[in-house]
Amino acid sequence: MIEIIQEYWKSLLWTDGYRFTGVAITLWLLISSVVMGGLLAVILAVGRVSSNKFIRFPIWLFTYIFRGTPLYVQLLVFYSGMYTLEIVKGTDLLNAFFRSGLNCTVLALTLNTCAYTTEIFAGAIRSVPHGEIEAARAYGFSSFKMYRCIILPSALRIALPAYSNEVILMLHSTALAFTATVPDLLKIARDINSATYQPFTAFGIAAVLYLLISYVLISLFRRAERRWLQHVSSK
């Protein structure tokens, strides 16, 4: 084990000398997909609870598709399937985008977490106390101001425990990136196993690194919950 760590620690953590690899790529996949998916989910969640069915139905359909199909299949569709379409081949921008395994992986992860996060946020919006909404209306708040100042801040706090679980699940989901030849942590562990024929050591090291990242994320979310949900836990 010591020999493997000494030889491959840079590849496992951040680079193989030619490109970013290992933990660095895993964190990039996680952060980029969670940030983009989360921002998009806030907008979609507002539409998800809309009384207008022409707004609500397309968003429901989007979340149904991406929550109802395996992420692995979604990644294969983007990485292996999209590039076979004539419209993609004939468009320089799309052609360049879908030829990149990293781009396809980020896209699949972003849309997948967006679908789950949309439902989490929509449920939290429905859970905002009705009294807060009535008070905002009594003060003459517009719908936009009411969402910005009252509903969304309360909903995001309510959603925090469920959202923390989604982020941890997304960390685990980044392990599928090797399918698109992205040199994430699991891909480097597989390469180490191929070079050394020591699967227990190679994948064991990867498991420890995933556990460490999970521990840091859980600690950060627990601290956030203690800060922003203190009024809930004290009741």
Curated annotation (Swiss-Prot):
Periplasmic side: 1-26, 80-104, 179-199
Gene Ontology CC annotation, any one: ATP-binding cassette (ABC) transporter complex
This protein's UniProt keywords: Amino-acid transport, Cell inner membrane, Cell membrane, Membrane, Transmembrane, Transmembrane helix, Transport
GO molecular function: transmembrane transporter activity
Transmembrane regions listed in the UniProt entry: 27-47, 59-79, 105-125, 158-178, 200-220
All copies of domain ABC transmembrane type-1, residue ranges: 23-221
Domain of life: Bacteria
Pfam families the UniProt entry points to: BPD_transp_1 (PF00528)
Listed Gene3D superfamilies: MetI-like
UniProt subcellular location: Cell inner membrane
Cystine pairs: none
Stated role: Part of the ABC transporter complex HisPMQJ involved in histidine transport. Is also part of the ABC transporter complex HisPMQ-ArgT involved in lysine/arginine/ornithine transport. Probably responsible for the translocation of the substrate across the membrane. Required to relay the ATPase-inducing signal from the solute-binding protein to HisP.
NCBIfam families with a match to the protein in the record: HEQRo_perm_3TM (TIGR01726), PRK15069.1 (NF011651)
Protein name: Histidine/lysine/arginine/ornithine transport system permease protein HisM
Native source species: Salmonella typhimurium (strain LT2 / SGSC1412 / ATCC 700720)
